[in-house]
Each structure stands twice: as C-alpha cells, then as structure tokens.
C-alpha cells in the first residue's frame, strides 16, 4: 500500500496529472471538455449544480465531491467501486453516493478512463480486494 501511495504521489506531482484539475484551477481546452463530459471536481460553493447526465459522488474520507458522467457508472472499474461502496455502506444508504476510495486513487482511475488506457493492475487489485 505504501508503494502505491508513493507512486500516486509521483503521478500527482507530474505534468500529466494537470489534465485533471479541480474547478478552482484553469484547465486546458482539451482537458476542459473531458472534465465537463465525464468527471469534474466541484468546490463546495457549486454543490447544487449538477449538469444533466451527470451524478455527484463523494470520494474518500475527505468526502471530496466529483461530478461524474452517468455513462461511466456502467464501466467495469466503476462497477467495482460501486460494489465496494455497497459493501462499505450498504445498499439502503440514503443521500449522496459515496465511494470508499482514496481521492488520488479515484483521480488515477478517472484519468486512465479518460485516456482510454487500461486501469493499472495495482489499482484493479485494490478495487478487487477492498483495500482502496
């Protein structure tokens, strides 16, 4: 787990990570269209606005809010995250959709999906064994 966190820290510090930014930062035109169409991080001031075809999800212990395209909910990796959520919080949870996953891991997953890359094996293992 420590090795994964170290790797995620390097990804977070790299230039590639800049493709996925919070709403408070100015994204490039290329990443801006992706952020609008699949996942964005919203500031607390913008919590009420969810674009049509998107779903708000809260990630990690920090309850970081992301707005995710509903199309991503059918992706096998996202289904794995939803299954982890069901195991952690139960199916009858009321209120917001929570993903029990570290924010950096979630961002890495979304970045892989955005780039059309397979989700890295170490992340798939984390989803599968419930240690995210």
From Swiss-Prot:
Basic and acidic residues compositional bias, start-end: 23-33
GO cellular component: cytoplasm
InterPro entries in the cross-refs: SAUR_fam (IPR003676)
Organism field: Arabidopsis thaliana
Similarity section: Belongs to the ARG7 family.
Keywords in alphabetical order: Auxin signaling pathway, Cytoplasm, Developmental protein, Growth regulation
Subunit: Interacts with and inhibits PP2C-D subfamily of type 2C phosphatases such as PP2C67/PP2C-D1.
Protein name, UniProt field: Auxin-responsive protein SAUR72
Biological function: Provide a mechanistic link between auxin and plasma membrane H(+)-ATPases (PM H(+)-ATPases, e.g. AHA1 and AHA2), and triggers PM H(+)-ATPases activity by promoting phosphorylation of their C-terminal autoinhibitory domain as a result of PP2C-D subfamily of type 2C phosphatases inhibition, thus leading to the acidification of the apoplast and the facilitation of solutes and water uptake to drive cell expansion. Plays a role in the regulation of cell expansion, root meristem patterning and auxin transport.
GO biological process: auxin-activated signaling pathway
Subcellular location: Cytoplasm
Region (Disordered): 22-54
